[in-house]
Amino acid sequence: MSIIISKTVKQELPEEKIRKAIELVLQGEKCEAEEISAVYCGDRLIRKINIEHLAHDYPTDTISFRLNSGNAIEGEFYISCDTVRRNAQEYESSFENELLRVTIHSVLHLIGFEDQSAAQKAEMTQKENRYLAALFHHDEK
């Protein structure tokens, strides 16, 4: 499995934790991955991607693209560090914690989870919380 982490922003990223978060979700959901590309960018790029692919003229925290339909996931996701920073302040969380939550959320989307309904959102939030707790518990060992 290949995990490619790249960024278009100067923000320092906890790359080891990002990689571990991706691996935890895949293992926990019993999924295999061929290649996952994680791109950490700013609002300008994610807004452009939203306009081109979803007809949304505003930035979002993440956008995920599954690139295949096979068993082993090939996909990419983009996360706006600008939006993550604003959300972290709004939710009274650290930037790193919110970044890892959105990373987990993005991987769940690649696996096929949706968040269109209240029930779907609740399921994804529950999974995000579980994987975040597992990630931080793993760091304490």
Curated annotation (Swiss-Prot):
PANTHER family: ENDORIBONUCLEASE YBEY, CHLOROPLASTIC (PTHR46986:SF1). Binds 1 zinc ion. This is Endoribonuclease YbeY. It is an enzyme of class 3 (hydrolase). It comes from the Bacteria. One of its GO terms (cellular component) is cytoplasm. Zn(2+) binds at residues 105, 109, 115. GO terms for molecular function: metalloendopeptidase activity; RNA endonuclease activity; zinc ion binding. Single strand-specific metallo-endoribonuclease involved in late-stage 70S ribosome quality control and in maturation of the 3' terminus of the 16S rRNA. Its EC number is 3.1.-.-. It is found in: Cytoplasm. Its cofactor is Zn(2+). Belongs to the endoribonuclease YbeY family. Disulfide bonds: none annotated. The keyword Cytoplasm applies. One of its GO terms (biological process) is rRNA processing. Its main location: cytoplasm. Keywords: Cytoplasm, Endonuclease, Hydrolase, Metal-binding, Nuclease, Ribosome biogenesis, rRNA processing, Zinc. It holds the Pfam family YbeY. The keyword DNA-binding does not apply.
